[in-house]
């Protein structure tokens, strides 16, 4: 369990990739990602294949700077190969790495939709089903833009990933 990692142990790099947030929400909760952040060195990196708006928004809200991992060929269906989150990056650090790119306007707008509502498990004891239900309930009550409206605007009939 992440809660058992001693606070003095810090990592330069954490690769977090179990399953998508819809399959394994426990490792994508606001609380779990906060513990990940606390385990990073001063300029530590978190790398994941996830492009989920909920994950990206949570990382930003936790104070990490995020970039997308560029696919070889960008299309409307393949616009990101994942996310890199950096704690205290050097100014314009992404420009030195050909695999990193700032989020596009489309991706930034995605972070303003109901898809960006985080997964939550304050006590670290909820089941996947409970986490997903809490999030769905919060999405239903939210005044954020429905994700379907965002998808239509960007000509996406289906989500390229589970958000």
Could you tell me what each predicted segment is?
Residues 1-7:
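S-adenosyl-L-methionine
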Residues 12-27:
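A short SAM/SAH-binding and catalytic strip from SAM-dependent methyltransferases
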Residues 83-163:
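SAM/dcSAM-binding transferase cores
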Residues 56-81:
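Conserved Class I S-adenosyl-L-methionine
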